[in-house]
């Protein structure tokens, strides 16, 4: 999979992304994170209605290599969790930005998006190895 970072998304240091969706903000993990994890076998996500806080763990992703926590790029209330990814974790691996999104949230403070990196900055970060 080519490591792509869509320009309409914003990225956290911890490799999660946030971007516009028809239900608020779509949250997932970047192609870089997916590439580092390898074969994904399990995804745990919060329930609809849960509150998540920026920088706090909101779930885990398990691969054949490791179990990693995922951290909220922005604070808000979960309005959708991608059941398809829970049922078929390979969707996350094959298409992290479209079919493999994780959550849709109503943001508590939309200005938190401005604190995240744009695609150019994020690409430079991961290609620089930091």
Curated annotation (Swiss-Prot):
The modification N6-lipoyllysine is found at residue 65. Residues 24-106 form the Lipoyl-binding domain. The keyword Cytoplasm does not apply. CDD domains: GCS_H. One of its GO terms (cellular component) is cytosol. Keywords: Lipoyl. Its cofactor is (R)-lipoate. GO terms for biological process: glycine decarboxylation via glycine cleavage system. Coiled coil: none annotated. Binds 1 lipoyl cofactor covalently. The keyword GTP-binding does not apply. Pfam families: GCV_H. PANTHER family: GLYCINE CLEAVAGE SYSTEM H PROTEIN, GLYCINE CLEAVAGE SYSTEM H PROTEIN-RELATED. The glycine cleavage system catalyzes the degradation of glycine. The H protein shuttles the methylamine group of glycine from the P protein to the T protein. Belongs to the GcvH family. The glycine cleavage system is composed of four proteins: P, T, L and H. This is Glycine cleavage system H protein.
